[in-house]
Swiss-Prot record:
Component of an amino-acid transport system. It comes from Brucella suis biovar 1 (strain 1330). Residues 1-23 form the signal peptide. This is Leu/Ile/Val-binding protein homolog 2. The keyword Iron-sulfur does not apply. SUPFAM superfamilies: Periplasmic binding protein-like I. PANTHER family: AMINO ACID BINDING PROTEIN, LEU/ILE/VAL-BINDING ABC TRANSPORTER SUBUNIT. Keywords: Amino-acid transport, Signal, Transport. InterPro entries: Leu-bd, Leu_Ile_Val-bd, Peripla_BP_I. The lineage of its organism: Bacteria, Pseudomonadati, Pseudomonadota, Alphaproteobacteria, Hyphomicrobiales. Belongs to the leucine-binding protein family. GO terms for biological process: amino acid transport.
Length: 371
């Protein structure tokens, strides 16, 4: 077993249905529950809890109830490794998580060596599954597919303009920016600027001045919503009237809170919104009745639990390796994202990425709507 001296793990157990017993199946939830990306952690937590409650009410995994164990990775690879080691030490055999590619990739090695199957609801970097470990699955799409859509969109719509591609130097952000750049170039357009900033930066005035001087008309951001919101707001404040485009790392209502009215017209790629599927109406109402809007990765986490439970029941076993085999061979599995099958790498069969635009909804609040 790999061990780590990293500390600071926030770990607690939740009994999903009734009292804990030695026969319960422990499922770890690895996500950023604190820090700048806690909004995504909350989405994952809520989605997993709701799906586990439903699964346990229907008999759990092969008749065994599911107990959830939480690990706060704070979107930090080092803390993620600490979470993974703690999960392994506690006997967790299944993990829904992690969210960030930079956390999921190193933790997956620990899980693979210790017989733990993981299903990542938001890890989009292709490397995660391209290594073809036995235990890595995701319920989200990949950045190479996302970059194709974003790059072509910019080449088609801004061919007479100038594009800046920015990223946050993380495996997710830079990986997405690189895939988008590749697609942009393959579609006959060359970016004017390609630059990285540090995750956590708050003052982008120098970068914005540089983009203004270069005559930038479209900005692509590979990164998360905290920096995106600041970039959008500061671009408006400094008079840079360029179209802002990003990926699935900004799909949080916190983006509008940070950017303010400047968020209007911002575009991003993401999968079709499960909230638009009438089959999910009852589930959506249940979330909203509890004061929670099930945006973004809520449904991807929910689908992760559904895939795990359905595969285990199809295999007639709760052994992680047997469940992994069933996930690849016994699909499709019915989920809130639709019927999902997994290929030999652990990637799901999902519809392509589409473009969204941020604008005010009927409730007067900003949200992202499919174009």
């Amino acid at each position: 077993m790999k061990k780590s001296l990293f500390c600071g793990v926030c770990l607690c157990a939740l009994v999903a249905m009734g009292g804990t017993s030695f026969a319960d199946i422990m499922v770890g939830v690895g996500a950023p529950l604190t820090g700048s990306q806690a909004a995504f952690g909350e989405q994952i937590k809520r989605g997993v809890e709701a799906a586990v409650a439903e699964a346990n009410a229907k008999g759990g995994m092969n008749g065994e109830q599911i107990t959830l164990v939480y690990g706060d990775d704070a979107a930090d690879p080092k803390q993620g490794i600490s979470v993974a080691n703690k999960f392994v030490g506690d006997g967790v055999k299944f993990v829904i998580g992690h969210f960030n590619s930079g956390v999921s990739i190193p933790t997956s090695d620990i899980y693979a060596e210790n017989g733990v199957l993981m299903i990542a609801p938001g890890t989009t970097n292709p490397t995660f599954t391209e290594r073809e470990l036995w235990n890595t699955f995701r319920t989200c799409r990949r950045d190479d597919k996302q970059g194709i859509v974003a790059g072509k969109y910019m080449a088609d719509n801004y061919k007479d303009g100038k594009v800046a591609i920015l990223h946050d130097k993380t495996p997710y952000g830079q990986g997405l920016a690189d895939e988008t750049k590749k697609s942009l170039n393959e579609n006959g357009m060359k970016e004017t600027l390609y630059e990285g900033v540090n995750q956590g930066d708050k003052d982008f005035s120098a970068l914005i001045s540089k983009m203004k001087a270069a005559g930038i008309t479209a900005v692509y951001w590979g990164g998360m919503h905290p920096e995106a919101g600041l970039l959008i707001r500061q671009m408006a404040d400094q008079g840079l009237k360029a179209q802002f485009i990003s990926g699935d790392g900004i799909v949080s209502n916190e983006l509008a809170s940070i950017a303010g009215d400047a968020v209007a017209g911002v575009m991003n790629t993401f999968g079709p919104d499960p909230r638009d599927d009438k089959a999910n109406a009852e589930l959506i109402k249940a979330f909203r009745d509890k004061g929670f809007e099930p945006e973004a990765y809520t449904f991807y986490a929910y689908a992760g639990v559904q895939s795990l439970v359905n595969a285990a029941n199809a295999a007639g076993s709760n052994d992680p390796m047997e469940v992994a085999t069933a996930m690849k061979e016994k699909g499709p599995f019915k989920t809130v994202l639709g019927d999902i099958s997994f290929d030999a790498k652990g990637d799901p069969s999902l519809s392509p990425y589409v473009m969204f635009e941020w604008r005010k909804g009927e409730d007067g609040k900003y949200n992202y709507f499919q174009k």
